[in-house]
């Protein structure tokens, strides 16, 4: 996703982008990675750095800028849980999702799930569809089949006995990305 953000915002070719994996030595702390949080936080910081690069390319070529660093920063400010401030902010982005299922009346099994999610800007729609499908399967398992027995906070069941859906048990899923 970050490469897509660079190509789109810096207006450079994909072949000119070298992706260097993250390192705690060179990467500032950007909080946890949950859901698509890093697409927002790291992505916005990346976009801001790209705008600086694009401005620099007005006067120099990309080759002349090799070795120069451009920094973008984005801080997703929220209030801690249980905060006493009026109208605390718990999230920096919100979405909306709705699901519909088609059930076989004879067997009681789900034949099809339709999930429509308003996600804001889907940077990688195919990946977004995959996240929706994964969320549907996890939700179905949580609601219908999964059991996670604990004894003093420790799991007591083997992984294969948790009631997770197997691939051949998953119904057709139609993911709709509302951008």
For each feature predicted by the language model, list its residue ranges:
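C-terminal catalytic domains of large/alpha subunits in multi-subunit enzymes
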Residues: 2-179
């Amino acid at each position: 996703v970050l490469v897509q953000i660079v190509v789109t915002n810096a207006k450079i070719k994909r072949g000119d982008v070298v992706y260097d994996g993250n390192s705690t030595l060179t990467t500032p702390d950007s909080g946890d990675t949950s859901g698509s949080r890093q697409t927002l936080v790291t992505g916005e910081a990346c976009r801001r750095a790209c705008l600086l690069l694009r401005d620099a390319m007005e006067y120099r070529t990309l080759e002349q800028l090799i070795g120069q660093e451009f920094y973008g920063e984005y801080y997703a400010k929220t209030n801690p849980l249980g905060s006493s401030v009026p109208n605390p902010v718990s999230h920096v982005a919100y979405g909306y999702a709705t699901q519909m299922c088609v059930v076989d009346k004879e067997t009681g099994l789900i034949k099809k799930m339709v999930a429509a999610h308003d996600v804001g800007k889907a940077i990688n729609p195919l990946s977004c569809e995959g996240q929706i499908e994964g969320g549907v399967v996890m939700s179905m398992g949580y609601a219908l089949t999964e059991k996670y027995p604990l004894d003093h906070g420790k799991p007591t069941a083997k992984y294969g006995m948790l009631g997770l859906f197997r691939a051949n048990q998953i119904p057709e899923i139609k993911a709709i990305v509302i951008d």
